[in-house]
From Swiss-Prot:
Repressor as UniProt keyword: no
GO molecular function, one term: acetoacetate decarboxylase activity
Active-site residues, Swiss-Prot/TrEMBL: 115 (schiff-base intermediate with acetoacetate)
Lineage, opening ranks: Bacteria, Bacillati, Bacillota, Clostridia, Eubacteriales
Name under which the protein is recorded: Acetoacetate decarboxylase
Role summary: Catalyzes the conversion of acetoacetate to acetone and carbon dioxide.
Organism: Clostridium beijerinckii (strain ATCC 51743 / NCIMB 8052) (Clostridium acetobutylicum)
């Protein structure tokens, strides 16, 4: 391969890249979202400045993605924390677990999604929408919601999906010193809502050293939503460079 061609490649291995080029379009993406109140002091310890806490809430999200351009079919689970940045409301993505290697690789390399390998599932059990997460063989989370009990306003569903996502991008140099340390923002685009529902929900988190979702304990369920949508991942942008701060 010519030297001029090397920099044109998206990632390694060159003969079989870990993921294809985007954009990444999601068809029939299914969300189970549960917003709950948690411990404010616990949130203060993990949300990085200059983000500001909006309230002592966490959004537990489970996403089934059966048809993703270039990445295939997979399921993802994680926690997002409502925040504000320069007056703009969005969600800080705290941790994400999924069962698809290309999606993990592209999320970490091409953006700043805090993705790790896990085993989430989203399914219907009789009249209940169920989301479960395992890390290795151990249970980490179980979420339940009545299946399509009450319609959710489509504008509200759109607003939930369209919120900006804030993430940390941290890469060390070969000398062990920070090479990249940035706050990133990305938004979903080309959103189409196919259906949305709300209803009663419960969430149980189990302590795990390497999947510490339970460190943000469930004190009260605030709301829940079940949303079917198509969307495209937006291009991430840098909003704050920690290494440029004197």
């Amino acid at each position: 391969m010519l030297e001029s061609e090397v920099s044109k490649q998206i990632t390694t291995p060159l003969a079989a890249p870990a993921f294809p080029r985007g954009p990444y379009r999601f068809h029939n993406r299914e969300y189970l979202n549960i917003i709950y109140r948690t411990d404010l002091d616990a949130l203060r310890k993990i949300v990085p400045e200059p983000l500001e806490l909006d309230r002592a809430y966490v959004r537990f999200e489970m996403m089934a993605m059966p048809d993703t351009t270039g990445l295939g079919s997979y399921t993802e689970c994680g926690q997002a924390i409502p925040v504000k940045y320069n007056g703009v409301k969005g969600d800080y993505l705290h941790m994400m677990y999924l069962d698809n290697e290309p999606a993990i690789a592209v999320g970490r390399e091409s953006s700043a999604y805090p993705k790790k390998l896990g085993y989430p599932k989203l399914f219907v059990d009789s009249d209940t929408l169920v989301g479960t997460l395992k890390y290795g063989t151990l249970p980490v989370a179980t979420a339940t919601m009545g299946y399509k009990h009450e319609p959710l306003d489509l504008k509200e569903a759109y607003a939930q999906i369209a919120r900006p996502n804030f993430m940390l991008k941290i890469i060390q140099g070969y000398d062990g010193k920070p090479r990249i340390c940035e706050l990133i923002c990305a938004e979903n685009t080309d959103i189409t809502i196919h259906g949305a529902w709300t209803g009663s929900a419960r969430l149980q988190l189990f302590s795990h050293a390497l999947a510490p979702l339970a460190d943000l304990p469930v004190l009260e369920i605030v709301s829940a939503s079940h949303i079917l949508t198509d969307l495209t991942l937006g291009t991430p942008k840098v909003v704050h460079d920690y290494l440029s701060v004197k």
